């Protein structure tokens, strides 16, 4: 059995999350949006909202729930990076911050997570 490194695990989780979102009619605008302030896994649009999504994937809860890895520090990074995206794209819209938690085969979409 091959073991995946952290990048491969992250890529797998993000791929699952993108498919999940597309099936629910979200429009994916960006993936892995990076700036000096941080990174946003997925930026999507639905129902007049721009949604900044952090994806956390784990096979088990040995290190806690995936959502617990979205610390206050990580939330601040995502918010600062989202501000950069809004400014760069000259957007004026409602936005929200979601977490997609993937634990094994279970997916939970936590809307307005922070």
Positions of predicted regions on the chain:
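Short, low-complexity, polybasic intrinsically disordered segments
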Residues: 102, 106-114
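Conserved catalytic cores of phosphodiester-cleaving nucleases, focusing on short active-site segments
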Residues: 40-61, 78
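Structural motif
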Residues: 37, 48-52, 94, 107
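Conserved beta-strand positions that form and line the central face of beta-propeller blades
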Residues: 32, 69, 109
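Catalytic cores of nucleic-acid endonucleases
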Residues: 57-105
């Amino acid at each position: 059995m091959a073991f995946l490194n952290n990048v491969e695990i992250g890529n797998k989780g993000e791929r699952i999350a993108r498919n999940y979102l597309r099936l629910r009619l979200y429009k994916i605008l960006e993936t892995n949006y990076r700036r000096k302030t941080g990174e946003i896994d997925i930026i999507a649009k639905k129902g007049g909202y721009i949604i900044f999504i952090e994806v956390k994937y784990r096979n088990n809860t040995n290190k806690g729930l995936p959502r617990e890895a979205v610390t206050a520090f990580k939330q601040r990074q995502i918010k600062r990076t989202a501000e950069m995206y809004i400014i760069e794209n000259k957007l004026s819209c409602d936005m929200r911050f979601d977490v997609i938690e993937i634990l094994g085969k279970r997916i939970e979409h936590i809307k307005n997570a922070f």
